[in-house]
A protein has these predicted regions:
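Hydrophobic (often cysteine-bearing) scaffold residues that line and stabilize catalytic clefts
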Residues: 8-12, 62, 66, 111, ...
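Active-site scaffold of zinc-dependent metalloenzymes
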Residues: 29-63, 76-80
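Nuclease and nuclease-like effector domains acting on nucleic acids or nucleotide cofactors
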Residues: 1-2
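Zn2+-dependent metallopeptidase catalytic core
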Residues: 6-26
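Short, hydrophobic alpha-helix immediately C-terminal to the catalytic nucleophile
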Residues: 16-17, 75, 120, 124
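Metalloprotease/metallohydrolase-associated module, dominated by Zn2+-dependent proteases
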Residues: 23-27, 84-137
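Catalytic Zn2+-binding segment of zinc metalloproteases
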Residues: 72-89
Length: 137
C-alpha cells in the first residue's frame, strides 16, 4: 500500500524508522533540512538529515529514495562500527589519498571514495527487498 500512491511524510518516517531498526542504528537522529538530495548522514552529529523539499515521494521516485536512504544508513553503520571520529578520519584520509593522486585512475575524492562506493553498492543491493517489503504494507 505504501508505494501505490504518493508516500506521505508520515509513511516516509515509518519506512526510515523501520530501516534504522533493522540495521541496528536506531539511535541515529532524524531531522529535516533544506537540501537538494533526499538525505545525508552527518557523521559529526549522528543525524540522518532528510530533505524538506520532498514532502511526498512519488512512486517513480521510490527506487532512488530507498537507495539514498540505504546508502546513508550504511554510513551510519560504519560510524557505529568504527566510532564516528575514527570513521570520519578514515573517510577523509581516503579523500585525501585520492586528491593527492595516490590511487592511479582515481581522481574524484567523492565518487572514487571506497566508503561511497560501498554505501552505494549496499543501497543498490538492498533496495529491491525493501521496495517489495513496503509495497506489501
Amino acid at each position: 500500500m505504501l508505494i501505490k500512491e504518493l508516500i506521505t511524510r508520515t509513511e516516509k518516517e515509518y519506512m526510515i524508522i523501520t530501516l534504522l531498526k533493522h540495521y541496528k542504528v536506531e539511535k541515529v537522529k532524524v531531522k529535516y533540512k533544506s537540501m537538494k538530495d533526499y538525505a545525508h548522514y552527518n557523521v559529526d552529529t549522528g543525524t540522518l538529515e532528510l530533505s524538506s523539499r520532498y514532502k511526498e515521494i512519488k512512486p517513480r521516485q521510490m527506487k532512488e529514495f530507498l537507495i539514498t536512504i540505504l546508502h546513508e544508513i550504511r554510513h551510519a553503520m560504519d560510524a557505529k562500527k568504527y566510532g564516528w571520529r575514527k570513521f570520519k578520519q578514515m573517510y577523509e584520509m581516503e579523500m585525501n589519498m585520492i586528491s593527492q593522486g595516490h590511487y592511479p585512475g582515481k581522481d574524484d575524492p567523492y565518487k572514487d571514495n571506497k566508503y561511497e562506493i560501498e554505501a552505494e553498492s549496499f543501497g543498490l543491493k538492498n533496495m529491491p527487498r525493501w521496495k517489495s517489503h513496503f509495497s506489501k504494507k
